UniProtKB/Swiss-Prot annotation:
Enzyme class: isomerase
HAMAP family (UniProt xref): DAP_epimerase
Function, in words: Catalyzes the stereoinversion of LL-2,6-diaminopimelate (L,L-DAP) to meso-diaminopimelate (meso-DAP), a precursor of L-lysine and an essential component of the bacterial peptidoglycan.
The EC number(s) this enzyme carries: 5.1.1.7
PANTHER family: DIAMINOPIMELATE EPIMERASE, DIAMINOPIMELATE EPIMERASE, CHLOROPLASTIC
Quaternary structure (record): Homodimer.
Annotated TM spans: none
A molecular-function term among this protein's GO annotations: diaminopimelate epimerase activity
Any one Gene Ontology cellular component term annotated for this protein: cytosol
Name listed for the protein in its UniProt record: Diaminopimelate epimerase
Gene3D superfamilies linked: Diaminopimelate Epimerase, Chain A, domain 1 (3.10.310.10)
Zinc-finger among keywords: no
Length: 284
């Protein structure tokens, strides 16, 4: 019987099964199917996916993230905060500020420590990718996708698309409590205009530094929070003149709040909690 030790952690209720690949060995060919199995709340552990904390040649640690459908994502904001917490608390890094490698490049983490435990984490997520080709999205000629008409099943919408290393499309709504998350979300996730699929976000603007946010995630469906999605929502809101550049913006997600700033230098900074739920051994 094969097995590996895991730590279940969450960022605002967006939980993953974390595996320390400095200590565990799992065949590459099994990673996708294992992500599906461990995510199952009935026959597995229960989570939005699986995250591997791996050795890296360019940073103290590398994060790989697998959604609950087994697809591998290229970035994960809530995951990065939990990886930073894990790395610091397990002595994998000595400084409170350090780099983490992702499939979409290097990001910088800064942990807040109280009595030896990481209570909050800031991630410099780097620059958003705004070109249509970088999302990626196919369709009109305009280089960026900002307030673009978008038809779905004969209904007209307006979208803005942003990549944080992974693809996001933002719909603005008047009332977040009635956003079509579970009806429009799964349709747009697989829309052919997004060749790699897309994370689908719904945003209600409160004022120039406050948003309400819900998400249908590519590969995981409805989650309590999406860190990269919240970053994309802030960038989209600045591009649409709805929130202020270089100003801390509170994003209210179902699982709690993130503080996000798109700085004048161009980077997106995200601050929020990261929590450990439990540890255990998974048999497969
Ligand atoms: N579903 C995403 C990966 C997880 C992102 C999200 N959980 C976050 O916190 O950023 C994707 O396939 O791009």
């Amino acid at each position: 019987m094969n097995k590996f030790s895991f730590t279940k952690m969450h960022g605002l209720g967006n939980s993953y099964i974390y595996v320390n690949m400095f200590e565990e060995t799992i065949p590459e060919s099994l990673l996708s199917s294992l992500a599906v199995k461990v995510s199952n709340v009935n026959t597995g552990i229960g989570a939005d996916g699986m995250i591997l904390i791996c050795p890296s040649e360019v940073a103290p640690v590398k994060m790989r993230i697998f959604n609950s459908d087994g697809s591998e994502g290229k970035n994960c904001g809530n995951g990065l905060r939990c990886v930073a917490k894990y790395a610091y608390e397990h002595g994998m890094v000595k400084d409170r500020s350090f780099f983490i490698e992702t499939l979409s490049g290097l990001v910088k983490a800064e942990v807040t420590v109280e009595n030896g435990a990481v209570t909050n984490v800031t991630i410099d997520m780097g620059k958003p990718r705004l070109k249509r080709s970088e999302i990626p999205m196919i369709g009109l000629d305009a280089e960026r996708v900002v307030a673009e008409p978008f038809e779905v099943d004969g209904k007209q919408y307006e979208i803005t698309a942003v990549s944080m290393g992974n693809p996001h499309v933002i719909f603005y709504v008047d009332d977040i409590t009635t956003a079509p998350v579970t009806t429009l979300g799964p349709i747009v996730e697989k829309d052919e205009r997004f060749p790699e699929g897309v994370n689908v976000e719904f945003v209600e603007v409160v004022n120039d530094h406050e948003l309400h946010f819900r998400v249908w995630e590519r590969g995981s469906g409805v989650t309590q929070a999406c860190g990269t999605g919240a970053c994309a929502a802030v960038v989209a809101s600045v591009l649409n003149g709805k929130t202020a550049r270089n100003k801390e913006t509170v994003v209210h997600l179902a699982g709690g709040d993130l503080i996000i700033t798109w700085t004048d230098e161009g980077n997106v900074r995200m601050t929020g909690p990261a929590e450990t739920i439990c540890t255990g051994v998974y048999y497969y």
